[in-house]
A protein has these predicted regions:
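Non-catalytic cap/lid and distal C-terminal segments of serine-dependent acyl enzymes
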Residues: 1-177
């Protein structure tokens, strides 16, 4: 991913070549993989979007495994339950969040979303996870709960719209380049 896809995109499309203009987002299982890849490469991504996969930040239940392009030693963070486990920033993702000020400097947006409808534990757990991140000093985390939707395209369309708007705002621009 990092060694092949980013150079290919930069070669074939008009892009700005720095991390401050690079985002990665994924939905469902792709959201989990996005978390794994971006957290292993916070020097390459400033905007991280986890659509119905935001549960990958922090403790709880989960599946494990590293994504292609991620450091195989990276410890992925499992999904939150309705009451997420305590958050240990020193151990998840090999400590990428251990220094909250440094993480906030590197990652401008950590966006997580779920649908509001059952299983409601996902949305409630995600809200609690964000509270834990903020309490631990991770200030650039954002949660969106899609009203009247579940694990479906409506949630993901709304999530992409919200993530894109937030990312442009956090970059301090009023329009996309």
């Amino acid at each position: 991913m990092v060694n092949d896809l980013i150079p290919w995109v930069d070669k074939n499309f008009r892009t700005l070549l720095d991390k401050d203009h690079r985002a990665m987002a994924g939905l469902s299982m792709g959201g989990g993989r996005t978390a794994t890849v971006t957290m292993a490469n916070v020097d390459k991504f400033s905007y991280i979007g986890l659509f119905s996969g935001g549960a990958q930040i922090g403790g709880g239940r989960g599946r494990g495994g590293a994504a292609p392009g991620a450091d195989p030693g990276t410890t992925p963070a499992p999904a939150p339950a309705a009451t997420p486990a305590a958050l240990d920033l020193k151990t998840i993702y090999n400590g990428q969040m251990a220094d909250p000020a440094e993480f906030n400097r590197k990652v401008r947006v950590l966006f997580m979303s779920f649908g509001a409808e059952p299983p409601i534990e996902n949305a409630e757990g995600l809200k609690r996870r964000q509270e834990q991140l903020i309490a631990a000093g991770i200030k650039n985390s954002y949660v969106y709960i899609s009203p009247g939707a579940t694990h479906e395209w409506q949630t993901w369309r709304r999530s992409l719209y919200t993530f894109a708007q937030l990312s442009v705002q956090r970059r301090g621009e009023t329009t996309c380049q």
